[in-house]
């Protein structure tokens, strides 16, 4: 498949990281630390997890809302444009996990930054995506750093009423 090479080796693609997989890795790190209680292991792994999470923040939440807004790939092998309940809830979980790990490692600034983002994200989901029954996706392509979809939409024939329903 395009994500791994068999036999083991370099993959030759330019695909984006899967947001749910990337963020799920941080939650798995937290789980393994909770099960093992190995603080030395956590201290070794934390800088790598921080690098991974900061990549996610820069790439998908550059405005610091606590939700993934920029186009983000996922393990369904599609791109989500705009905030969605699925990947954003995993993001909030990863932020919360990092806040707990940072606090345990006596990194209060990191803990507060991640906690604040997670709290803001949870509030955003409830306010903007919850429809009283479930969390919806808010498809967004305007006002993002990635303008490729907005440029594509400008070329779409708008004479069809169905197109307006989709956009």
Put a short name on every predicted segment.
Residues 1-64, 82-102, 115-118, 122:
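Aromatic-rich carbohydrate-recognition surfaces in CAZymes
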Residues 61-86, 90-167:
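Catalytic cores of carbohydrate-active enzymes
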């Amino acid at each position: 498949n395009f994500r791994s090479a068999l036999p083991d080796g370099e993959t030759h693609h330019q695909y984006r990281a899967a947001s749910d997989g990337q963020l799920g890795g941080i939650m798995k790190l937290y789980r393994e630390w909770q099960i093992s209680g190995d603080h030395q292991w956590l201290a070794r792994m934390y800088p790598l997890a921080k690098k991974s999470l900061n990549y996610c923040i820069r790439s998908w939440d550059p405005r610091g809302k606590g939700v993934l807004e920029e186009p983000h790939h996922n393990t369904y092998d599609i791109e989500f444009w705009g905030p969605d309940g699925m990947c954003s809830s995993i993001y909030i979980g990863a932020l919360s996990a990092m806040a707990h790990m940072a606090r345990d490692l006596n990194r209060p600034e990191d803990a507060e930054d991640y906690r604040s983002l997670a709290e803001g994200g949870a509030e955003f989901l409830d306010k903007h995506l919850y429809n009283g029954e479930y969390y919806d996706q808010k498809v967004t392509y305007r006002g993002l750093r990635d303008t490729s979809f907005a440029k594509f939409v400008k070329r779409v024939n708008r004479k069809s009423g169905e197109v307006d329903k989709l956009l």
